[in-house]
From Swiss-Prot:
Gene giving rise to this polypeptide: prfA
UniProt function note: Peptide chain release factor 1 directs the termination of translation in response to the peptide chain termination codons UAG and UAA.
GO molecular function: translation release factor activity, codon specific
Phylogenetic placement of the source organism: Bacteria, Pseudomonadati, Pseudomonadota, Gammaproteobacteria, Lysobacterales
PROSITE patterns noted in UniProt: RF_PROK_I
Keyword match Disulfide bond: no
Modified-residue entries (N5-methylglutamine), positions: 235
Compartment(s) where it occurs, according to its Swiss-Prot or TrEMBL record: Cytoplasm
NCBIfam families: prfA, PRK00591.1
Protein name, per record: Peptide chain release factor 1
Length: 361
């Protein structure tokens, strides 16, 4: 481990002691929001503390084994214990380095999934539908809920646009690298000549804003429209203007919801999504400024970035952000088997973050 990373570990150990002291302060205990926030931070540092304690024990074992090596009768046993202790220290060194990768506080939370057809006409809408189904099936495997907030079906299947809320622990941590442009190469069902077409769809992954995140939305900045829903709810939704469209005039962000029977419920859902979009826009602006000095291969979340190509004739998926990341398992992946792909992206992200930490940036 580099000296820079070791100093960061020591700083985290000091912060843990400071947090333990703060959480016993009556003033902090009486402030629910602050107490909850500091408790969450302390719980995130516990794995680091446990690994450092284990490292200290392994170092003590190594020292004892090295001392025992001076005894001729114990030398053989000492050599075995030295090898075991050194192997454990190497393992803990790698573990501690990964624990230094900053945890995104949004990782455990829910998200909004937006899939939109891009270039390619009807085939793009069909592909957008395929992508949405891929994520929905992956969510089902994880035990998450997928709630469609609004959709615009394509004329020949799929979606021109679909927005859903994905609810489940760790949802954002697993899907946050999916934002960007996804391209497909295949022979459309409507293609009589058997020619391969290329079309695209864009995906946006937006973390749901936490209740404690402060963002002030001036009601005067909102333009609210109602319209008849075409969503769930039977005939009732077509008789009343229960669907809501909210435009945040200063930013131009537009959200809508039509899945609930009541206008009030649709408005609540739409406002939750609007808050998430505005919070994420501020985060993206800050991240873009930070990234000007350094190129992030994974996790930029830029919707205009072409991140992946799905080549059906070859059964191949290529992620363009990671060198050599090509998987010949398209049939299973498009059916929601995303674990191998996500694992590679997470590994690349961790390596990228560790490189940044080692450089002290």
């Amino acid at each position: 481990m580099t000296p820079t990373l070791r100093r960061k570990l020591e700083a985290l150990a000091e912060r843990r002691e400071e947090l333990q002291h703060l959480l016993s302060d009556p003033e902090v205990v009486s402030n629910n929001d602050k107490f909850r926030s500091l408790s969450r931070e302390l719980s995130q540092l516990e794995p680091v503390a446990l690994a450092m304690q284990e490292e200290a024990r392994a170092k003590a074992d190594l020292s004892a084994a090295e001392a025992m090596r001076n005894d001729p009768e114990m030398r053989e046993l000492a050599e075995e214990e030295i090898l075991a202790a050194q192997a454990r220290l190497d393992e803990l060194d790698a573990q501690l380095a990964l624990l230094l990768v900053p945890r995104d506080p949004r990782d455990e939370g829910n998200l909004f999934l937006e899939v939109r057809a891009g270039t390619g006409g009807d085939e793009a809408a069909i592909f957008a539908g395929d992508l949405f189904r891929m994520y929905a099936r992956y969510a089902e495997r994880q035990g998450w809920k997928v709630e469609i907030e609004s959709d615009s079906p394509g004329e020949h299947g799929g979606y021109k646009e679909v927005v859903a809320r994905v609810v489940g622990r760790g949802a954002y941590s697993r899907l946050k690298f999916e934002s960007g442009t996804h391209r497909v190469q295949r022979v459309p069902a409507t293609e009589s000549q058997g020619r391969i077409h290329t079309s695209a769809a864009t995906v946006a992954i937006i973390p749901e804003a936490d209740d404690v995140e402060e963002i002030v939305i001036n009601p005067a900045d909102l333009k609210v429209d109602t319209f008849r829903s075409s969503g769930a709810g039977g005939q009732h939704v077509n008789k009343t203007e229960s669907a809501i469209r909210i435009t945040h005039v200063p930013s131009g962000v537009v959200v809508e919801c039509q899945t609930e029977r009541s206008q009030h419920a649709n408005r609540d859902k739409a406002m939750k999504r609007l808050k998430a979009q505005l919070v994420e826009a501020e985060r993206s602006k800050a991240a873009a400024a930070k990234a000007q000095t350094r190129k992030l291969q994974v996790g930029s979340g830029d919707r205009s970035q072409r991140i992946r190509t799905y080549s059906f004739p070859q059964g191949r998926i290529t992620d363009h952000r990671v060198e050599g990341l090509t998987l010949y398992d398209l049939p299973n992946i498009i059916e929601g088997d995303l674990d191998a792909l996500i694992a590679r992206l997470l590994h690349e992200h961790q390596a990228d973050e560790l490189a940044r930490l080692s450089e002290g940036t």
